[in-house]
Every structure is written in C-alpha cells, then in structure tokens.
Amino acid sequence: MAKEKFERKKPHVNIGTIGHVDHGKTTLTAAITAVLAKQGKAQARAYDQIDAAPEERERGITISTSHVEYETDNRHYAHVDCPGHADYVKNMITGAAQMDGAILVVSAADGPMPQTREHILLSRQVGVPYIVVFLNKCDMVDDEELLELVEMEVRDLLSEYDFPGDEVPVIKGSALKALEGDPQWEEKIIELMNAVDEYIPTPQREIDKPFMMPIEDVFSITGRGTVATGRVERGTLKVGDAVEIVGLADEPKSTTVTGVEMFRKLLDQAEAGDNIGALLRGVSRDEVERGQVLAKPGSITPHTKFKAQVYVLTKEEGGRHTPFFSNYRPQFYFRTTDVTGIITLPEGVEMVMPGDNVEMTVELIAPIAIEEGTKFSIREGGRTVGAGSVSEIIE
C-alpha cells in the first residue's frame, strides 16, 4: 500500500497527556483516537499499542514514549504519552517531546496525587504554556459535590504553580467508557478536543521566530572573509541582514551577512532546519568560534547565571554512580560546546542522587546565549550525567 502523503493543510500542534500513574492517561489517549476515528480524523490505537511505547534516545538518555497523531476540524495534532513517571520527567526536561500544551488527567475518584503536582511543576519549569484538565473516571463518582471538590482542588493546584487555575477548561468524563463506545461519554471526548482546539493557541512556527543559528564551525575564505557554519534553529536569514555574534564574550559583536550558501550553492534566504554557511562582513577568523550563536540583533543575550530543572542520569543510563553536592563543577553542554559551571543546590537539599530530578542554580565561567527553556546536557569527562532546562535567568 502506498504511503499517504502528509498534507499540511491545517496548523500543527504538539500536545501530550500528563498526570499521576493509573489516573488514565493512556486510556484517554486511546479514547481520543477511537472517538476521532469514527469521524475519520484518526486511526484508532488500542491501549496496548500505546502502552508498549518504543524506547528512544535523546541526549544519551533512554526514554519510552508513544506518539499518536490525529486531527480535529481545525488542526493536526501530534500527541505524546509516556508509560512511566520517569519517562515524563526525562521527556519534559530534555525537550524530546516539546509540548505546546498538555492535557492533565486527574482521576475524579482519587483527586490530585503527588505526580499530579510534580507534572504541573515540571510543566511550569520547562515552559509548557497551557494546560487543559480532564477529570477522568467520573462514571465511578455518584456525588456531584465530590466532583466539584476535586475540580476546585485541581484549579487551586494549577494556580499555585502560576497557571490560571480559574480559567483552565475542566472536562468531566470517563476515558474507559468512551473507549467502550458509550455515546454519553464519547461526547465528553469531543468536548475535551473542542477545549484543546480553543484554549491552546496555535504555536508560533520556528520559521516565524527571530533568527538564530548555533555556530558549529568557522573558516576563512581568502579574499572573501570569515564563514560561520551551522544549522538554522529558528527564523530566516537573508543576504544583507544584520546579525549579532552572541556568547563566550561579554558583549555581542554586530556584523552583516554578505553571503548565505547551502550545499555550496548561493541562497537568497535560509530558514529553520537548513544547514548553511554565512559569510560575515568585517569579522576576523579569531572573533568568532564554535559555541557562539548568530542571532537577530537584540533577540538573545549572553548570561552566566541561571536556575534550571535538571534530571540526573542513573548509573544504568551511563550516569554517575555516586551523588554530587553543591559546588560540583561539571561541563554544561549548550548546543555545540561545553562550558564549565558551578552548581548550587537549593536550601535544604544536601546532595543529589543519580535518578533525581532537582532544581539548581548554575554559574558558568563564560557567558552563553541562553533564555528560559534553553536545553542543555551536563557532562563529566565526555559522558552525559544529566539533562536540564533553563527555568529562570539570574544574570
């Protein structure tokens, strides 16, 4: 059978199910595909298919993730679901599955549980911008007042982590009953998808963001000048554009791009995803190096101190065998280069064990172009021992 061509007629949005173990995340994922399949907008995926998530490697970390896709009238969705709690932590921190919004699944019979809280915190820390709530297992709760109580608890919890708890859509349903084809509960899945359609905005596409390219290599062409090469991470670049070289120096350096080429051919415009060489006017070979970024002027600034949410690899994942303490000095790998940094643990945290997920403050010995949400690896002697996401810039 010929492969269907991927038609991009609708805006694309990345979402995922989050929440406590056994509250019904995977059942809900299956129910969404089943209900939308009846409208011809998805392929129904059985619970077992989703639950048997394949292992993937992201930054040297093994993560099990299931990917399903489906459509609504307005959009095309890519949806991630993880079998285990640790997979969520790793997924969100490494950015393996960048979510534009999440469906928080809470069992109405149990109310918010520890991982409910942890997933909300993680969403806040790694920059998941919007959350829609699905109160699951409502068929098991006869008491309307109890449902309202659980809803209030969830809203309060969201507000506690700076999500707009009062405005977040909360849909009461039963994923299992919907999956079994009960029309009353299928309706709730449609209601949920309408809420996701309306409440989670279409994300800005990478190509529409301000230009940035991490520099991978630099060389000089006699008589023409200095060329920086790399893969455009976001935005577009045209000949004649002003750019800044940011990072590894206290002040960004301004220059103009006098040529853009790709596969040795000259290009009018490079865009997100292209591997290019950019010819830089008036820049000598020693003024630009791997680890810096080329960026639209003023769009990103160099920093040395920040807070980050970090997942520390277990020894089975090839990480450390022993804990580390404040003042630990590993290498922080941002995009294309390592920079040494000093870690300060939060008050009351004595040490960090392999397998932990922790917030920490980092001070780099050289400034790097970073912003909230920038991902990095922590390395020690060339091996990855942690993965992190910048949650707050300090200086």
From Swiss-Prot:
GTP hydrolase that promotes the GTP-dependent binding of aminoacyl-tRNA to the A-site of ribosomes during protein biosynthesis. It is found in: Cytoplasm. The gene is tuf. It catalyses: GTP + H2O = GDP + phosphate + H(+). Monomer. This is Elongation factor Tu. Mg(2+) binds at residue 26. PROSITE patterns: G_TR_1, G_TR_2. Its main location: cytoplasm. CDD domains: EF_Tu (cd01884), EFTU_II (cd03697), EFTU_III (cd03707). One of its GO terms (molecular function) is translation elongation factor activity. Residues 19-26 are annotated as: G1. One of its GO terms (cellular component) is cytosol. Residues 60-64 are annotated as: G2. Residues 136-139 are annotated as: G4. GTP binds at residues 19-26, 81-85, 136-139. InterPro entries: EF-Tu_GTP-bd (IPR041709), EF-Tu_GTPase (IPR050055), EFTu-like_2 (IPR004161), EFTU_2 (IPR033720), G_TR_CS (IPR031157), P-loop_NTPase (IPR027417), Small_GTP-bd (IPR005225), T_Tr_GTP-bd_dom (IPR000795). Residues 174-176 are annotated as: G5.
